[in-house]
């Protein structure tokens, strides 16, 4: 069920407004990239970016004075905003909050994040993630959503008043809609927003997000790209002494490797040279954090490339999600499914899997596994499509729950004593055999 379907409007209305037609079955894996806000020519986006940076400077000023746990929680800790239905959640829209650990990471590195060393055009909050090991696209996106929540509320309110029937709109007091610098606290504000009713019967507001600030992959400023772009970063260094030192340090590391290979009568491997260059650059960044700023300057100088790549990522992900899910939904409706509510969760799970297999293999549902002639290679895509065959069920279908033994793909249940685990693996996955070990762990 998509936003447009739920509220009885054509999907083109949402598209023309510039928003994403979100799904109420599961999150769409798209994330806000702050660099797209910074690069935009829209005045409202420019002001939005200024407000984001203003809050980061506020955090830096407070961090300099030292903070109590209460202050750390109030200013540095953020909850996930599930109302935009974007992110990783495979079941509904509830993901993980940024939490205390991320708050302390932010607190510890806020000075690094706000110091440009007079190199870049502006501050960028995603600079903080250059110190973060692993993917940070969901974290920086969630952080940004929290800091622009008021804008997203106004953006959605305007759409709702213009295009939706009043019966779908309700007044909500949205918590932490904006930050009041006089009281130094987040403030609630009332908005008229579309809503859905949760499984627990609670009315929850819905937020639309502009497509032009979203992408599927990592934000333009990210750690992996920083390390991969070491040659481009070196070319950006306008400090002659620093550039000479960086080049000499990397050259010495390569020479040491080549001498070692020569002593051991081994040939020089080009891939090894590249790795040594990258590792040397990584070590240099610890000593000279200005290198991070030269990298950001490099990204700032390529706004067209950033926008083009983000647009391609977003468009492909949406087209894949829309077209493939609609293909599968149509097949499911045409074929029908006999719902049996008096059987065990295990049998119901097996029946739904058989039905899913039948749709894919015998009803041309396999077309939903391809996009532009290319096979979908991600298990996540297959899992999202599997969600659509569970229509009309009274069983609880949780995607990626964690019972303390790691995440299972799905747990189907009706009470504590009537549960079944479902694991997905592509046949091409080298760890296919491991799935049976995983299930035993989950069942323990």
Which ranges hold each PLM region?
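Long, contiguous, compositionally biased segments that the model treats as domain-scale units
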Residues: 1-173, 182
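Anionic group-transfer/hydrolysis microenvironments
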Residues: 35, 411, 425
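Nucleic-acid nuclease catalytic cores
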Residues: 167-168, 386, 444
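The feature marks a conserved, polyanion-engaging helical scaffold used by nucleic-acid processing enzymes
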Residues: 181-392
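Short beta-strand
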Residues: 398-403
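Short beta-strand or tight-loop elements
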Residues: 406-408
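Active-site beta-strand-loop-beta-strand hairpin of nuclease catalytic cores
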Residues: 411-421
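Catalytic cores of nucleic-acid endonucleases
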Residues: 425-444
């Amino acid at each position: 069920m998509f936003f447009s379907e739920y509220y009885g409007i054509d999907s083109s209305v949402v598209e023309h407004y510039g928003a994403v037609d979100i799904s109420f079955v599961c999150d769409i894996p798209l994330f806000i990239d702050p660099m797209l806000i910074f690069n935009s020519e829209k005045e409202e986006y420019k002001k939005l970016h200024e407000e984001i940076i203003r809050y980061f400077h506020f955090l830096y000023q407070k961090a300099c004075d030292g903070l109590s746990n209460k202050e750390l929680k109030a200013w540095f800790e953020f909850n996930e905003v599930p109302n935009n239905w974007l992110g990783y959640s495979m079941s509904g829209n509830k993901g993980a909050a940024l939490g205390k650990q991320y708050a302390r990471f932010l607190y510890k590195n806020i000075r690094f994040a706000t110091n440009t060393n007079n190199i870049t055009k502006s501050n960028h909050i995603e600079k903080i993630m250059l110190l973060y090991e692993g993917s940070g696209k969901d974290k920086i996106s969630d952080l940004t959503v929290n800091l622009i929540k008021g804008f997203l509320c106004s953006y959605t309110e305007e759409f709702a008043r213009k295009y939706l029937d009043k019966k779908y709109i309700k007044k909500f007091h949205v918590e932490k809609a904006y930050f009041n610098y006089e009281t130094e606290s987040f403030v609630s504000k009332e908005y008229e927003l579309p809503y859905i009713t949760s499984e627990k019967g609670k009315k929850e507001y819905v937020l639309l997000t502009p497509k032009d600030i979203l992408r599927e992959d990592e934000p333009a400023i990210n750690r992996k790209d920083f390390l991969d772009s070491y040659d481009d970063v070196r070319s950006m260094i306008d400090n002659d002494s620093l550039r000479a030192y960086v080049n000499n340090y990397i050259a010495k590391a390569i020479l040491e490797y080549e001498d070692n290979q020569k002593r051991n009568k081994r040939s020089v491997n080009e891939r090894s040279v590249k790795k040594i260059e990258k590792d040397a650059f990584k070590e240099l960044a610890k000593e000279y954090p200005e290198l991070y700023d030269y990298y950001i300057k490099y990204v700032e100088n390529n706004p067209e490339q950033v926008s083009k790549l983000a647009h391609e990522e977003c468009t492909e992900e949406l087209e894949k999600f829309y077209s493939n899910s609609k293909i599968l939904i149509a097949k499911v409706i045409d074929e029908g499914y006999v719902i049996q509510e008096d059987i065990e969760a295990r049998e119901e799970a097996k029946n739904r899997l058989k039905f899913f297999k039948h749709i894919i293999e015998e009803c041309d549902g396999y077309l939903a596994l391809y996009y532009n002639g290319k096979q979908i290679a991600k298990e996540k895509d297959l899992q999202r499509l599997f969600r659509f065959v569970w229509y009309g069920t009274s069983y609880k279908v949780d995607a990626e729950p964690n019972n303390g033994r790691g995440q299972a793909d799905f747990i189907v249940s009706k009470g504590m004593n009537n549960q079944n685990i479902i694991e997905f693996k592509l046949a091409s996955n080298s760890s296919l055999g491991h799935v049976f070990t995983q299930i035993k762990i989950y069942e323990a």
